[in-house]
Amino acid sequence: MVTNNIEEYKGVYVFAQQVDNEISGIALELLGKGKELAAKLETEVTAVLIGYNVKNLADKLAEYGADKVILVDDPELETYRTEPYAHALASVIEKYKPEIVLVGATAIGRDLGPTVSARVQTGLTADCTVLEIGDFPLVAIPGQEQKHNQLLMTRPAFGGNTIATIACPDNRPQMATVRPGVMQKIAPIAGAKAVIEEYNHGFTPNNKYVTIKEVVKAVSDTVDIMDAKILVSGGRGVGSAENFKILEDLAEVLGGTVSCSRAVVDNGWKPKDLQVGQTGKTVRPQIYFAIGISGAIQHVAGMEESDLIVAINKDETAPIFDVADYGIVGDLNKVVPALTEQLKAAKAEKAAN
């Protein structure tokens, strides 16, 4: 589908990802951002709900900002598979002509988004950290038309070492994927209702359809760092994988979870799913300990909205202190164990009383 008349494309659409009849958090976050973008464009937010027997989820989408829900419900959509889901979303785009389409940068979204963008012949910017409406080019260039009300999609590039702002001025829809935790949900409006429109273009299984023989769900006994209320995060300054034991001891006393910077993952000390930052996860815990972390902008972007930030670093000029609410300049190998012991003693005293 080549865009012939851009003016025909209206509205902000959000792919409302659901798994096992439960709306994913990223869908609610994107509805919040979609509401903001739609207000600037003076249009509506539409959630595209794809699955089987999922109509009951529409009210929740309305509570989090959807003005309208387009429901594509079919037995072929019971479990995510690339071809039927791509067919469903592409068919919606071709019929309704949205100006903007937002998809979560989840395992599903990273597969679905680019497949659909190729199918409808438009561009897609992946793993965005900022979405806003503005002019493009950002600065007027003599002799070149500056287009207004464009979706400006900002994302880290070159391994997070630079930030790129990208637009898609000549094609519609403008498509972006966004990492979970980057955008914020709106406060739910209890009892809100959305207009529901059911649409099914039909499904004809072909050689692109895979057959799912069995679904094996991973079981984890660890807390997702995006859900943790207290994070004890370590950086290169921790020194080694073994030395993370002192951070784990502190986290245990606090009832928190250990996380880390990209340098730690690059060194093989901790797995990728514990990484905080632009190329990791965006977190907003109640308390964030930044231990042995210098405070590179890429890391700060992933944790600066924490309620309380405590930084421990031997370098008093480390940028992390610029965003910290409390800072301790000192050797983490001495400071952290001492802090852990003090907290243990305080807990024991409280328990005794």
Where are the language model's segments positioned?
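N-terminal glycine-rich FAD/FM-binding segment characteristic of electron-transfer flavoproteins
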Residues: 1-353
